């Protein structure tokens, strides 16, 4: 549901056996793994949508993505009724959207953001990294390099969001294989663009 017509649903990396072993090693008792037809009947026509938070960043180029994310996550919460749910900070916009959804709809669950986990060379871990060949994998390191540059500029006292994001873009653009969708400084809660690097702020890029 959160995948668009030309996106990678069919080829998205899945390894249930590996996931199950990791869960078992972590002490998990039960894995919830429904079939698509169990979650979405032929008559399914109800969706969760949101204004504002889903129109910036990834929402501009993937207009139905967050509607799908919110719908499937809310269904999961209703079925499983968890006390806590964990979402990676790597997708900061998704985390903000889910937090807003559970607040607005009075869902009794605590949303916890999990820090980004990186490979030894700095690349953020992601199931989609398997799509990269050796050359692309090496080129992708420019992303973590841009993050470090932004952090250094902010630590050195640069307060202008435009100055920091411009410097990050210029670094990424030096990598021939890189294609920038956006590099933006936004409020971490509202996902609205900001002009100053003042908390709560994050720089999102794709």
Predicted segments, located by residue:
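Long, charged alpha-helical interface segments
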Residues: 145, 205-206
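Nucleotidyltransferase catalytic core that binds NTPs
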Residues: 1-179, 185-198
């Amino acid at each position: 549901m959160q995948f668009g017509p030309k996106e990678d649903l069919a080829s998205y990396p899945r390894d249930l056996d590996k996931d199950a072993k990791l869960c078992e090693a972590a002490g998990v008792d039960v894995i919830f793994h429904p079939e698509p037809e169990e979650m979405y009947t032929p008559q399914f026509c109800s969706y969760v949508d949101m204004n504002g938070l889903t129109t910036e960043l990834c929402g501009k180029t993937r207009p139905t993505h967050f509607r799908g994310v919110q719908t499937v996550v809310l269904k999961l919460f209703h079925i499983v009724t968890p006390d806590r749910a964990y979402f990676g900070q790597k997708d900061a916009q998704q985390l903000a959207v889910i937090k807003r959804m559970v607040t607005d709809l009075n869902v009794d669950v605590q949303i916890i953001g999990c820090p980004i986990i990186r490979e030894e060379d700095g690349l953020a871990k992601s199931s989609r990294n398997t799509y990269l060949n050796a050359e692309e994998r090496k080129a992708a390191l420019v992303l973590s390099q841009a993050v470090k540059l932004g952090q250094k500029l902010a630590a050195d006292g640069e307060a202008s969001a435009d100055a920091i994001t411009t410097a990050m873009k210029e670094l990424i653009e030096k990598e021939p294989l890189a294609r920038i969708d956006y590099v933006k400084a936004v409020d971490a809660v509202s996902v609205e663009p900001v002009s100053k690097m003042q908390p709560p702020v994050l720089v999102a890029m794709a």
